[in-house]
Amino acid sequence: MVPGRLWRRGVLAVAAVGALLFVWWFVTTPPALPTREGHVTAVTTVGKPVFVGVWSTGSDFGRELHVAGVRLRADATVAVDLEPLLCRGGSVGVTSDPAPFCRELLDPAGTTLGPGDSLVVRVVAEEPGAVYLDRPSLAFREGPRWGNREAGTEAVLAIVTP
């Protein structure tokens, strides 16, 4: 083998590995989703679900996310049921009935989230207590890119006796 050819092959191999690493990085690191400081505050009674809006995309949201799932993490003083929901075509602050605010209320896994949609968490507990809900983490694909990103805001809830 001629030394020039060996050197050229080495450079090509390094360039190919570098290109593959760049493509892997690009595909697995989509841009961050909007987050907000502070938190949403809600109060509900034992056994009564409350719907808390934790992220609203707004009509100027220029992205379309194909949602694979939503992960919720909460610290609570009592057992609590949490269910992420996609509010299609609307947004919710805090309510016991999201129907007037959402065109559709769906399981976000397998749906597309776009402008004017929002993420809502249904919270219900069978005992009085407190819940601190972290920002939701969305697993999504956007074009060729996919990843997990936090979005929206945190929530603090009080569950009281009726």
Predicted region positions:
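Non-catalytic macromolecular-recognition regions in eukaryotic signaling proteins
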Residues: 2-162
